Amino acid sequence: MTRYAAPGTEGAIVSYQSRYDHFIGGEYVPPARGQYFENPSPVNGLPFTEIARGTADDVERALDAAHEAAPGWGRTSVTERSDILLKIADRMEANLERLAVAESWENGKPVRETLAADIPLAIDHFRYFAGAVRAQEGSLGEIDDDTVAYHFHEPLGVVAQIIPWNFPILMATWKLAPALAAGNAVVLKPAEQTPASIHYWLSLVADLLPPGVLNVVNGFGVEAGKPLASSPRVAKVAFTGETTTGRLIMQYASENIKPVTLELGGKSPNIFFEDVWARDDDFRDKALEGFTMFALNQGEVCTCPSRALVQRGVYAEFMEAAVARTELIKPGHPLDTDTMIGAQASNDQLEKILSYLDIGRQEGAKVLTGGERIEHDGELKGGYYVQPTIFEGHNRMRIFQEEIFGPVVSVTSFDDFDDAVKTANDTLYGLGAGVWTRDMNTAYRAGRAIQAGRVWTNCYHAYPAHAAFGGYKQSGIGRENHKMMLEHYQQTKNILCSYSPKKLGFF
């Protein structure tokens, strides 16, 4: 066990600044209106830094810097851009522990996750797109003996990126790595709940990028996010967050006919067929671990498997074991490497989760375990902690249909394959799903039948850089990750060239 010291205390490997301004044009600049807001740690509910409160004036200044930098960055050779991304990855790897502690303190998640997943994945995403852009090629089409169609990949120019609070550094990386690799300049707005860890990351890597290529404007959605998303000066808007906000982002961008990538909410089903229980072996144990994935990152994941569907013939035995497995999840100090579940990211999110715990009870759902806030004493007093909770009910309940974004799973049974698929698809969302079975025919058929952008099969919560990610239905538009993302941040230029000296013959 390792217990990291809180940032800024004796023995700490991380120190946050007392104040962070906007990062514009390669330097920190104060907010145009001189306003700041406090940023509390979910670990104890206490402010640890203050953040510049951005407005439209700050957004315009950032766009000025981005537009000045974009042409030069777009003309920079692919080799040089790739090398810079690799240097960013190397710098992050050299400071992995510091980044992990910084993010855990600001977001509340267990440091075991940031050490093993969040930061290593972010590093790998930069390396992946550094390689992908080197391998990308245009195309040539021979129309006839004298006519050739050339196709070139050109950057969009200046793009807007709005980042969520559940994975501050990783979600920024998902957007930044392909955008920068493709030759774009970026204006990024972090979530108002978690802006500081982005600035800590910037303190490590900002010197590697030309001034103006990456600009960060802090602030709240209406004050900074709206003017950024609605600006005619951006060529694309990429957003990750809840569906209601995504709908607004789409409206803002549509006013200027700008493309959007939206990674939105989910209510992902995790389906356990009865053959999972056929033998008491490693696979059964793996499936039980798969059930508990609803508590990963405190359930603050868009693809959280927040609905579990268990085949009726094994339901009682499976759920007895699943409840026991869930109760082994260890809460505690987020900076302790033994802690398995930390704090919710904000007090607002804590209150939302607690309200859904009440809703579930009012609907008649049965609490199989959990269902309460965790009240810690000592240095965790005032933090935002919730017990992993299992509800038993039916798919028409609000707790089955609405995104809670907390460590809460709603469980029901199904009769057969068709019943499982019908229940899985009975939702407005379609971001992720899980299928657990020993029969690969069942696995394949279920994966194709479920209306979701990603279907994990005998696994869950894996996010490799080279696997496309995105939603069906109201879970979003577009994809993230995979080399296809380069083209999402590019436009295709066609030069149709005739080498014939003869006349066209029209007139």
Swiss-Prot record:
Annotated catalytic residues: E263, C302
Catalysed reaction, written as an equation: an aldehyde + NAD(+) + H2O = a carboxylate + NADH + 2 H(+)
Transport as UniProt keyword: no
Name by which UniProt lists this protein: Probable aldehyde dehydrogenase
Entry EC number(s): 1.2.1.3
Lineage of the species this protein comes from: Bacteria, Bacillati, Actinomycetota, Actinomycetes, Kitasatosporales
Keyword Protein transport in annotation: no
Alphabetized InterPro entries for the sequence: Ald_DH/histidinol_DH, Ald_DH_C, Ald_DH_CS_CYS, Ald_DH_CS_GLU, Ald_DH_N, Aldehyde_DH_dom
Superkingdom to which the source organism belongs: Bacteria
The organism of origin for this protein: Streptomyces coelicolor (strain ATCC BAA-471 / A3(2) / M145)
